[in-house]
Structure formats: C-alpha cells, structure tokens
Amino acid sequence: MSFVPGQENAGSRSSSGNRAGNGILKKTTWADQTERGSNNQNRGRRNQPKQTATTQPNSGSVVPHYSWFSGITQFQKGKEFKFAEGQGVPIANGIPATEQKGYWFRHNRRSFKSPDGQQKQLLPRWYFYYLGTGPYAGAEYGDDVEGVCWVANKQADTRTSADIAERDPSSHEAIPTRFAPGTFLPQGYYVEGSGRSAPASRSGSRSQSRGPNNRARSSSNQRQPASIVKPDMAEEIAALVLAKLGKDAGQPKQVTKQSAKEVRQKILNKPRQKRTPNKQCPVQQCFGKRGPNQNFGGPEMLKLGTSDPQFPILAELAPTAGAFFFGSKLELVKKNSVGVDEPTKDVYELQYSGAVRFDSTLPGFETIMKVLRENLNAYQNQDGGADVVSPKPQRKRGQRQVAQKKNDEVDNVSVAKPKSAVQRNVNRELTPEDRSLLAQILDDGVVPDGLEDDSNV
C-alpha cells in the first residue's frame, strides 16, 4: 500500500496507465499529454507518431516522468534554485510528514523563435518527485546530481524511499504546488498553475497558422481557453512589472524622512482597527505600548510590524471577517467621550473575545509555536517592564545652566591667585634657612606672624 497525494487515506500504487497491446505498461510523457488536445485539429493530415520517453532522444524538451505537482518556472536569469533546510516539499492531503522527502528536477525546455526572428532559449522549469520516484529514483538523498535540488521535511527519514504511488495522468491531475506557511520561494521563480497552459498555447498557435477561414472554423468546433500563455510569457511578465515600476527592479526604492513621515501619517489617520504597522509606522505608534492588555510582540516584531519575515506565518492564524463576527462573543459598550471640544460625541466600543484553535497537523506548526513563544508577553522579559518606543533623550530643564554654573566655579577656583607671594608658603614647613632669608627680605627684619615654624607650636 502506498500513499496517494490528494487523498485522505493511503491508496495502492496506481498501475492503470497506458498499456500497449502486449499488456506492458508504457511510460507516458508530457509530450503525449500535449498532443492529446491537438489531435482533433489534424484534419486532412497524416497522424504523426507520438514520441515517448522510449522513442524520443533525450533532447531536454520532454519530461520523462509525471510529477504529482505543477512546476516552478524560472523568470530571472542567474538565480539559484534552493530552499532553506526543512522547506521545499509541496504539501498535499494524505501525505504524512514522514513521507515528505524528495527532490526538484530541472527540466531544460526547448528554444523558440521570437517575432523578430531571433532564437531564444526558455528558462528551465523544475518539477518535484518523491524520494525513490522520478528520473532519479535510484539516487540516494543528498547525492551530488546535476540539476537536482534535494528537499525534505525535518520529520522525514531520508535514508529510505518515500512510499508514494506513481502518478497516472489518466486518473490523477497535477496538484497545484503550494508550500507550508513560512516557506520562502527561491528568488526569480514563480509557481505554475495546473499545467494546462502548454497545450492551450500549442493549439492556439496552430489555429493561427491555418488562415482566417480555418481559424474561425477551429474556434467554432473547439472551446477557446480563457487566456493563451505564450512561450515567452515569463519574459513579458518581467518586462511589464519593470514598466509598471518605472525603473529597474534591482535598485531598491529609497525611503527618505519625508516619505516615511507621510506613510506614518497616512497610517495613523486610519481608524485604529484598520492600521497596518510597518517599518515607517511601528507597532507601538499604531497601537500603543505593550502591557497586559496588548501583550504580543517582541523587540524585532515591534520594530518591523507586518514587515517582519515571521509575520506571514502568524497571519495564517488570523480569523476572517466572517469568523470574527460569527465565531466571537461581541459586546457593544458606550464609552465616555474624551474630546474636550466635542462633549456630546457618542463613542462606542465593539468588544470581542474568541479563540483560534489549531493542532500539530497544521503545516508549519513548529514554526508557529516558536514565533508565538517568542512574542507572547515578551514585554515582561524586557528592561523596565513594558517595552516602549525609546524617544530621543531629553535634557532636563535647567540642567544646562546647573552644569555651566559648576564649570564656572571650577574655573574660578583654578584661576584664583594668592594675595601675596608669602602666602603661597603658609602651609609649607619652614626651615631655618627659609626664616633667615625671609628676615633679610623684610624691612624690619622680623618674621611676620603666621610664618612661625610649625615645629615650635
């Protein structure tokens, strides 16, 4: 018995597939799937033999194995495809964490001719296969294989193969790729949809090459897709994004003090329940200092607000508007107006209480628990109790004058001079030679009072 992605319970390994006349299971390729939707358009033409993994040379344009998930396409050159440790395995119903292990396989796509006649190479697309399946079913986890990126859940044992059934395209469609909350997609890549864009593109291009009459007939006999994806759609998307931004995306937008002030004021002008804290308007400027009634947020999250990299995983726990109103206890309370200029203004509070329940089966459970522990009642572990936004140090009133007065007193003491040269030696013990010398200097020949030798006292 093997697990089947997308099903709640484990199922047996699929073995239906496409069978040849001798009853042998024939491996089906992406090329076969692509040709199915266009065979009904080959009117008056001799059917071409289908190319499979056994009949077509390995030219890099055919994926020889079916992945359970849609691919991840590169749209920026020079970007490395990798995931953080413990991330990168697509999630699907029915697959336990112990079986979430495998690898991403790089599929080098074919080139195409642009409208101006130039030959362009499509950037590669990556497909996920569980460990022990796919083109490198015999490889061990972590082997150095070109075009392979190994990923695994932290709870998975990578020493054994995953007990996952092979995907039969006639029975199971590709599952849209999605990851556990907190997963960071490699920069320069985007997740494909259901995997049906290639046949739509091929059938659309064929109908355009037949002329207006045949194209009209084809459109009447076949339902047109909602949107036709061209081979160079990734490049066009990138160009449109850059044009929308009006500058190179590689140059970060500079935030000046004036722009940050405008953003902060714009946020603070909104009602309290509509504010979204960020770097320009931190949490405590939006909602006040931390304390028993507002007890969430560590130093880093208070500083960054929703811009904190850990915040998206917390947003998975946030209730929807429907859950807020219909799943909470609500109470309408009238409050006294605090406005002096508007004493008759009616102020109400919609007080609410509720709970968000989750268990260890929630994707990203360990990360969520870690973030919650770091931020719940974090103000109690900080110096001075509740963490407040540290204002610029203010000089106490009169502090400058007091300091200046002390400096003046020190200066006065340092520059004060004795009234006479004799007084400088008052505290010095006089020797007989000193007394004799002083007697000669003075007119009367008598040593003044106060200059007597301390030894005679």
From Swiss-Prot:
Keywords: ADP-ribosylation, Host Golgi apparatus, Phosphoprotein, Ribonucleoprotein, RNA-binding, Transcription, Transcription regulation, Viral nucleoprotein, Virion. The modification Phosphoserine is found at S170, S194, S390. Residues 9-23, 193-212 have a biased composition (Low complexity). The modification Phosphothreonine is found at T177, T431. Its main location: virion. Residues 260-383 form the CoV N CTD domain. InterPro entries: N_prot_C_CoV (IPR044344), N_prot_N_CoV (IPR044345), NCAP_bCoV (IPR043505), Nucleocap_CoV (IPR001218), Nucleocapsid_C (IPR037179), Nucleocapsid_N (IPR037195). One of its GO terms (molecular function) is RNA binding. Residues 267-277 have a biased composition (Basic residues). Residues 267-384 are annotated as: Dimerization. Residues 1-62, 158-178, 190-228, 249-290, 382-429 are annotated as: Disordered. ADP-ribosylated. The ADP-ribosylation is retained in the virion during infection. Phosphorylated on serine and threonine residues. Residues 64-193 form the CoV N NTD domain. Residues 56-197 are annotated as: RNA-binding. RNA binds at R109, R125, R167. One of its GO terms (cellular component) is viral nucleocapsid. Residues 49-61, 215-225 have a biased composition (Polar residues). The keyword Phosphoprotein applies. Packages the positive strand viral genome RNA into a helical ribonucleocapsid (RNP) and plays a fundamental role during virion assembly through its interactions with the viral genome and membrane protein M. Plays an important role in enhancing the efficiency of subgenomic viral RNA transcription as well as viral replication. Homooligomer. Both monomeric and oligomeric forms interact with RNA. Interacts with protein M. Interacts with NSP3; this interaction serves to tether the genome to the newly translated replicase-transcriptase complex at a very early stage of infection. This is Nucleoprotein. The lineage of its organism: Viruses, Riboviria, Orthornavirae, Pisuviricota, Pisoniviricetes. The gene is N.
